[in-house]
């Protein structure tokens, strides 16, 4: 079968979940004997009001009569492409115009600005119409499916997939640190880790692996809270370093706000480590079972208590980590199974 994978591209950005998602799918389809082309159009804007122009570019892209048997779209606004047959596997929509609208910490769009409201209404209308053209709609999590139902009245089938380092992650000793992995930006809430550490009874260390716009602020906050000796900001680490950090962690702290899926949870479970997340973290809560394979905290104080529980009892961390590995095995399909689901009946 000739399959087109259609998605967006961030120029000069290497890695990232969306990039891996597209590359992983294309590689898996090719391994199964399909002929695959990946179509990417850069998505980004110098000004927030360029979002409609960016969306319109995708609607102008016509893949009909190109010989493609099926087009699989992944990310807004690739859903808008014209094709004889298309299916969506939705990573997420343009969240600044959806659940993050009117949240200044996560979105530049506000209901107090008429132009912003008009853009939001247009994108919601277009998403509903063009996703409605799909033969089938899949999502990468229940969280994304719930948003699609709430805002667009469309049903999506949650379809999980393996994380980037799935074949290479390994378990190791339960060391003296908790690990935080990801970009240092507002929606990942790295500041919550520092708030919690300041409240812990134990002197457990934290290693932060990642870079982003909040890096300097995080370093200043650690100093202000007297945590300099307990918080190590590693910056951007290599894949091998990340694998080693997962292997040696006591637990992984992952508290994003309404995350779509969250590879960190899955990677931690593959490394046999428990995960501490938040009740409003979205995707991670689809996997983390409170008191079974991790903890689901509700505020900085309960996050601190969860960190202390693992710091004081490495056997508990080991039991929860083993349960996390079992959760992964029960929940996450192989890439072959993912491809079979996406192409079923095509």
Map each language-model feature to its residues:
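A charged, aromatic-enriched C-terminal amphipathic alpha-helix characteristic of glycosyltransferases
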Residues: 312-345
């Amino acid at each position: 079968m000739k399959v087109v994978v259609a998605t967006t591209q961030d120029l000069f950005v290497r890695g990232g979940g969306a990039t891996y998602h597209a590359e992983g799918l294309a590689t898996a389809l090719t391994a199964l004997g399909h002929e695959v082309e990946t179509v990417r159009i850069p998505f980004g804007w110098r000004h927030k009001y360029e979002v409609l122009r960016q969306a319109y570019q995708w609607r102008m892209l016509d893949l009909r009569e190109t010989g493609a048997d099926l087009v699989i779209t992944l990310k807004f606004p690739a859903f808008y492409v014209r094709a004889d047959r298309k299916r969506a596997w939705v990573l997420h929509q343009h969240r600044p115009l959806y659940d993050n609208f009117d949240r200044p910490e996560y979105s530049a769009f506000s209901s107090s600005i008429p132009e912003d409201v008009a853009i939001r209404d247009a994108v919601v209308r277009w998403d509903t119409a063009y996703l409605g053209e799909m033969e089938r709609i899949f999502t990468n999590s229940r969280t994304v499916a719930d948003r699609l139902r709430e805002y667009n009245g469309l049903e999506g089938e949650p379809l999980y997939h393996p994380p980037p380092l799935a074949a290479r992650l390994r378990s190791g000793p339960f060391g003296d640190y908790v690990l935080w992995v990801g970009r240092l930006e507002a929606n990942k809430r790295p500041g919550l880790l520092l708030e919690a550490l300041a409240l812990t009874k134990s002197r457990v260390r934290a290693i932060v692996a990642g870079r982003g716009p909040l890096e300097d602020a995080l370093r200043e906050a650690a100093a202000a809270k007297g945590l300099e000796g307990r918080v190590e900001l590693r910056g951007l680490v290599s894949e091998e370093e990340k694998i080693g950090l997962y292997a040696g962690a006591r637990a992984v702290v992952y508290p994003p706000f309404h995350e779509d899926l969250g590879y960190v949870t899955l990677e931690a479970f593959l490394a046999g480590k428990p995960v501490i997340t938040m009740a409003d973290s979205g995707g991670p809560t689809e996997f983390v079972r409170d008191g079974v394979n991790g903890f689901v905290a509700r505020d900085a104080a309960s996050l601190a208590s969860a960190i202390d529980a693992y710091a004081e009892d490495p056997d508990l961390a080991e039991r929860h980590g083993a349960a996390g590995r079992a959760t992964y095995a029960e929940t996450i399909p192989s890439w072959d199974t993912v491809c079979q689901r996406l192409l079923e009946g095509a």
